[in-house]
C-alpha cells in the first residue's frame, strides 16, 4: 500500500508536468505558424527543445526524490518519534516533552561497556534498532574504571564516533559517565568536569544529546553529601556550552533512591533523575517508590533488564511486563541493558553474534522481549 501511494504520486506529477509542457508546446507552434522569419523559427524550435528537456529533467528529479525518500523511510518507527520532529527536549510538569510541548517517551538500547562490546555500536546495527525495532534512543556506556576513561582517555573518541552515528540517524543519544566500582561520583569529579567540558563544547546545543553524569552511585554515600554536590558542579560545567539539553543524574543505591532526590532536587529546569531496575529483584516496592517521587521530580530509566540485579539470574518476563506498563502509563523514557553478546541473561544477543547482524536468529530471550517492548 505504501509503495502504491508513492507510484500514484509520481504518475500524477508526470501528468501535471506533461499537461503544462503540452500547453507550452502548442503555444510555441502557434507562434511558429505566424512567424515568417526563419531565424525566429529556429529560435522557437530551440525554445521548444529546451522546454522538452526541462520536462524530462523535472520528471527525473521527481523520481529520484521519491527513491531517496524510500531509502530514508523507517518501517519500525514513526517519523514523529525522531529528533527532526521533536527537537530539543525539555521538562514540563515533571515529565519529558518535545519542543512543541507534546509528551514523548524515548525507548531504546544501552551498550555494555564500549571497551568490551563497542563493536556492536556501529551504524548498521543502530540503524537496524531504529528501523526494525522502532528505537529512538541509544545510550553509550563509557565506563570510568575497568579500562574506561580513567585508564584510557582515547575512549572518548569511540563515544563521539557512536554519538555522531546516532545524530546522523536522527536519534537521541545518551552520553553516559558510567561509574560503578568507583562508587562515589566525587572521587573523580575533576575528570568528569574535564570530559563533560570537552563533550559539551563539541556538541553545544545539539538537540540529540542527553548527558548522564553518574551512572550508579552506590556504597556508603548519600544524596546530600556526595551525589548532589557532584551533580551541581558538573551540571554547571555542561551548562556553559549546552544550555538546554536534558541532564540525567544518578541516585543512590545503584539508582534506586529516587525518593531521596525528590526530597531535595537540583535547581535546574531540565534535569532528570535516574531509576534503574532489574525485573527479578526490583518489583512493586520500587514502583511505589517511583510513583511517589514522580510527584516532585521527572524520572528516566536509563538502565533496566529482564534478569535479576546480577544481570544473569533468570528471565522474569511477567515482572518486566508490569514495568513496561508502569513506564508507559507514567511517560517514563528508558534504555535497556545491554547491546552485547555476553553470556548472561540480560544480554540482547546470543554469544558469538556477528557484529553487523542483529536479526531475530541472533536474539536472546531478552532481546526478543525488548524488541517487542520498544514496538509497543
Show the residue positions of the predicted features:
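N-terminal Sec-pathway targeting helices
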Residues: 2-16
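Hydrophobic alpha-helical membrane-insertion segments, chiefly the h-region
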Residues: 17-28
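N-terminal carbohydrate-binding accessory modules
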Residues: 32-36, 40-48, 53-137, 373
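Acidic active-site catalytic centers that drive phospho-/nucleotidyl reactions
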Residues: 98, 176, 303
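Short, histidine-centered active-site or binding-site loop motifs used for metal coordination
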Residues: 110, 144, 177-181, 215-217, ...
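Aromatic-lined substrate-binding rim segments of carbohydrate-active enzymes
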Residues: 122-182, 189-194, 239-241, 319-330
Amino acid at each position: 500500500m505504501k509503495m502504491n501511494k508513492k507510484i500514484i504520486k509520481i504518475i500524477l506529477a508526470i501528468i501535471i508536468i506533461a499537461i503544462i509542457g503540452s500547453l507550452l508546446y502548442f503555444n510555441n507552434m502557434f507562434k511558429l505558424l505566424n512567424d515568417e522569419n526563419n531565424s525566429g523559427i529556429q529560435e522557437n524550435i530551440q525554445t521548444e527543445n529546451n522546454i522538452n528537456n526541462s520536462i524530462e529533467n523535472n520528471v527525473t528529479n521527481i523520481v529520484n526524490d521519491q527513491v531517496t525518500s524510500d531509502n530514508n523511510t523507517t518501517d519500525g518507527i514513526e517519523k514523529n518519534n525522531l529528533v527532526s520532529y521533536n527537537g530539543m527536549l525539555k521538562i514540563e510538569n515533571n515529565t519529558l516533552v518535545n519542543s512543541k510541548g507534546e509528551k514523548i517517551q524515548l525507548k531504546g538500547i544501552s551498550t555494555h561497556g564500549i571497551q568490551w562490546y563497542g563493536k556492536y555500536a556501529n551504524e548498521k546495527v543502530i540503524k537496524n534498532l531504529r528501523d526494525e525495532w522502532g528505537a529512538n534512543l541509544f545510550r553509550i556506556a563509557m565506563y570510568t574504571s575497568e579500562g574506561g576513561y580513567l585508564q584510557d582517555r582515547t575512549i572518548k573518541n569511540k563515544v563521539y564516533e557512536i554519538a555522531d552515528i546516532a545524530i546522523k540517524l536522527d536519534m537521541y543519544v545518551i552520553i553516559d559517565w558510567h561509574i560503578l566500582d568507583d562508587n562515589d561520583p566525587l572521587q573523580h569529579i575533576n575528570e568528569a568536569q574535564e570530559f563533560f567540558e570537552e563533550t559539551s563544547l563539541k556538541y553545544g546545543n545539539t538537540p540529540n544529546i542527553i548527558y548522564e553524569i553518574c551512572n550508579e552511585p552506590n556504597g556508603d554515600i548519600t544524596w546530600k553529601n556526595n551525589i548532589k554536590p557532584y551533580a551541581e558542579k558538573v551540571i554547571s560545567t555542561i551548562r556553559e556550552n549546552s544550555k538546554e539539553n536534558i541532564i540525567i543524574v544518578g541516585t543512590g543505591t545503584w539508582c534506586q533512591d529516587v525518593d531521596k532526590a525528590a526530597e531535595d532536587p537540583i535547581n535546574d529546569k531540565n534535569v532528570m533523575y535516574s531509576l534503574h531496575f532489574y525485573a527479578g529483584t526490583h518489583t512493586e516496592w520500587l514502583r511505589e517508590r517511583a510513583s511517589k517521587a514522580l510527584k516532585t521530580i521527572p524520572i528516566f530509566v536509563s538502565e533496566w533488564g529482564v534478569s535479576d540485579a546480577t544481570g544473569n539470574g533468570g528471565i522474569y518476563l511477567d515482572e518486566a511486563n508490569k514495568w513496561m506498563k508502569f513506564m508507559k502509563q507514567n511517560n517514563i523514557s528508558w534504555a535497556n541493558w545491554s547491546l552485547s553478546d555476553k553470556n548472561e541473561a540480560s544480554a540482547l544477543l546470543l554469544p558469538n553474534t556477528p557484529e553487523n547482524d542483529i536479526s531475530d536468529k541472533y536474539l536472546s530471550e531478552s532481546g526478543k522481549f525488548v524488541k517487542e517492548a520498544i514496538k509497543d
